[in-house]
Design a protein with these regions (language model features):
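Membrane-interface micro-motifs in multi-pass membrane enzymes
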Residues: 1-6, 10, 14, 107-124, ...
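Aromatic-rich transmembrane-lumenal/periplasmic boundary elements in polytopic membrane proteins
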Residues: 193-224
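Transmembrane-embedded, aromatic-rich helix segments that form part
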Residues: 45-57, 90-91, 163-173
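Alpha-helical transmembrane segments of multi-pass membrane proteins
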Residues: 3-11, 29-32, 45-51, 120, ...
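Membrane-interface transmembrane helices that cradle and orient dolichyl/undecaprenyl
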Residues: 9-29, 36, 55-66, 127-143
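Juxtamembrane "helix-exit" motif on the non-cytosolic side of transmembrane helices
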Residues: 84-104, 131-135, 154-161, 179-181
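Membrane-interfacial entry segments at the cytosolic side of transmembrane helices
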Residues: 26-27, 63-75, 107-117, 136-147, ...
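Membrane-interface alpha helices of multi-pass inner-membrane proteins
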Residues: 29-41, 149-159
């Protein structure tokens, strides 16, 4: 399945390249993000397609590419791979764990109550952020706050152990959004939709934990 997702994702970026100048071409990007989320639940091999995807995107959007631009595109792709591997894949579970500890250990609520609360809050945050980027009359402050909140809840800044890196990355994102004179709203909307479908696809990994909790006769992923 991992090889299938890898081949399919690369084929889809070529389909996007053909239709990049047409309306609603970004739907191919969203489909790629969803398939990447599904593939993460199987194997991380699919993330190796990101540098190729970024290069195809760069060469299509910039008709006169340069060596400097190519190197920058590669660096951006490596950063995206790092954010996916150590941000979304691990950070999402880490933030969910913080909620679980807060609700169970601090509030004295039943097990998994923090997980349910986190899923509801994350879904509400993503829907709010996407809704803010689709309004006819944009409210910049609300849009930026909802975007930052969604990024934090997705665990993207939580790279490594501790809170220092998370605080620095969140502060840098906040400073960039509020200090920039012009923010690309379409880009923010595309990022949010892609992240949302990645999480939906990544949720397929929950099957491993659900099956392990059921205590089947062959249980190699037992939480205990």
């Amino acid at each position: 399945y991992s090889s299938l997702f890898t081949a399919l994702v690369f084929w889809l970026i070529l389909k996007w390249e053909e239709a990049a100048d047409r309306p609603h071409a970004d739907r191919w990007i969203v489909l790629i993000a969803y398939l990447m989320g599904l593939s993460i639940g199987v194997h991380l091999l699919n993330l190796l397609c990101i540098p190729a995807i970024v290069l195809v995107y760069y060469y299509k959007k910039f008709p006169n590419p340069t060596m400097k631009g190519t190197l920058i595109a590669l660096l951006v792709s490596f950063a995206i791979v790092g954010l996916m591997m150590y941000g979304v894949v691990q950070g999402l579970v880490e933030v969910c764990g913080y909620f679980e500890l807060l609700f169970v250990n601090t509030f004295g609520m039943p097990y998994n109550s923090g997980v349910y609360a986190f899923v509801i809050i994350l879904a509400a945050s993503l829907i709010w952020a996407i809704w803010e980027t689709m309004q006819d009359e944009i409210h910049p402050v609300r849009m930026k706050i909802s975007f930052i909140l969604s990024i934090v809840l997705l665990g993207i800044p939580f790279i490594g152990s501790g809170y220092v890196i998370a605080v620095i990355l969140t502060a840098a994102l906040t400073a960039y959004l509020f200090m920039s004179k012009k923010v690309n709203i379409k880009m923010l909307n595309t990022i949010l939709v892609c992240l949302m479908v990645i999480v939906v696809g990544y949720s397929s990994y929950a099957l491993t934990l659900i099956r392990a909790t059921a205590d089947t006769p062959m249980n190699q992923n037992a939480p205990q």
